[in-house]
């Protein structure tokens, strides 16, 4: 148990790294860096090609390394335009993170992409596409609790992402 008069001892603790053996070897050095995203201000309507391009320009001007393209990019931007957006970002020194719905029987949230992260074959296919197109990472959202099945999904996503050198943000989770 870690306690303190402030959050510092909890946030700064190294106990997990001191007592748990590393189970997997990282495929690369993962460094998130600074980033921005449009959803915090514009929500779903902001997930379009032109707005994301403006955010890439903003990130480049600020010296940020990433832009998170949030929910609905698969339908409001589409895969071909996302490839174009990723190339544009690279030309500005900015990498992209893409939002994904975790899906499964626990999740009926309509935002997409859906039906990918809970399916090993589709997930690995998507990650191969991301790797090919220089996508830096994913934000996976709407997890359904903290049962063993969900913990296994976290681990499966992390294992596959590591195989493809994809960084991961878990959101809406334990």
Residue positions per predicted region:
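Conserved structural scaffold segments of CAZyme catalytic domains across common CAZy folds
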Residues: 1-97, 103
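Aromatic- and carboxylate-enriched substrate-binding clefts and catalytic-loop regions
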Residues: 71-174
């Amino acid at each position: 148990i870690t306690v303190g008069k402030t959050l510092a001892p909890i946030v700064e603790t190294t106990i997990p790294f001191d007592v748990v053996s590393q189970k997997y070897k990282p495929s690369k050095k993962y460094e998130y860096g600074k980033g921005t995203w449009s959803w915090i201000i514009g929500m779903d309507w902001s997930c379009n090609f032109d707005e994301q391009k403006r955010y890439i320009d903003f990130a480049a001007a600020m010296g940020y390394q990433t832009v998170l393209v949030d929910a609905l990019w698969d339908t409001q931007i589409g895969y071909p335009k996302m490839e174009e957006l990723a190339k544009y970002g690279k030309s500005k020194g900015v990498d992209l993170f893409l939002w994904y719905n975790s899906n499964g029987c626990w999740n009926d949230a309509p935002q997409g992409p859906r039906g990918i992260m809970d399916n090993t074959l589709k997930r690995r296919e998507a990650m191969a596409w991301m790797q090919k197109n220089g996508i830096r990472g994913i934000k996976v959202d709407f997890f359904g609790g903290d049962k063993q099945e969900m913990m296994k999904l976290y681990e499966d996503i992390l294992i596959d992402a590591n195989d493809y050198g994809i960084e991961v943000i878990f959101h809406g989770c334990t």
